[in-house]
Amino acid sequence: MPKMKTHRGAAKRFKKTGTGKIVRHHAFTSHILEKKSPKRKRNLRKGTVMHKTDAKRIARLVAYL
C-alpha cells in the first residue's frame, strides 16, 4: 500500500505536542481589534488544544506530524 499524503493546508495550521495533543491558533485576530480588550487579544495570541473529536479528524489529514 502506498504512503498516505499529508494534507499540506492542515500541516501548516496544526502542531502536535509532546503528549500527542493537537494545537491550533485562535481565530478573530486579524482585524476589528479596536473593540477587543488587551487581555482578550493577548489570550488570542496563545495556541489552544483541539477538542478530542476534531483532533481525530485532523490526525487523519496529517498522519506524519
UniProtKB/Swiss-Prot annotation:
Record bears the keyword Ribosomal protein: yes
Entry GO CC: cytosolic large ribosomal subunit
InterPro entries: Ribosomal_bL35, Ribosomal_bL35-like, Ribosomal_bL35_CS, Ribosomal_bL35_sf
Cystine residue pairs: none
Domain of life, per lineage: Bacteria
SUPFAM superfamilies in the record: L35p-like (SSF143034)
Identification of the protein by name: Large ribosomal subunit protein bL35
Entry keywords, A to Z: Ribonucleoprotein, Ribosomal protein
Ribonucleoprotein as UniProt keyword: yes
Cited NCBIfam families: rpmI_bact
Gene Ontology BP term (one): translation
Family of the protein in this entry: Belongs to the bacterial ribosomal protein bL35 family.
Any one GO molecular-function label of the UniProt entry: structural constituent of ribosome
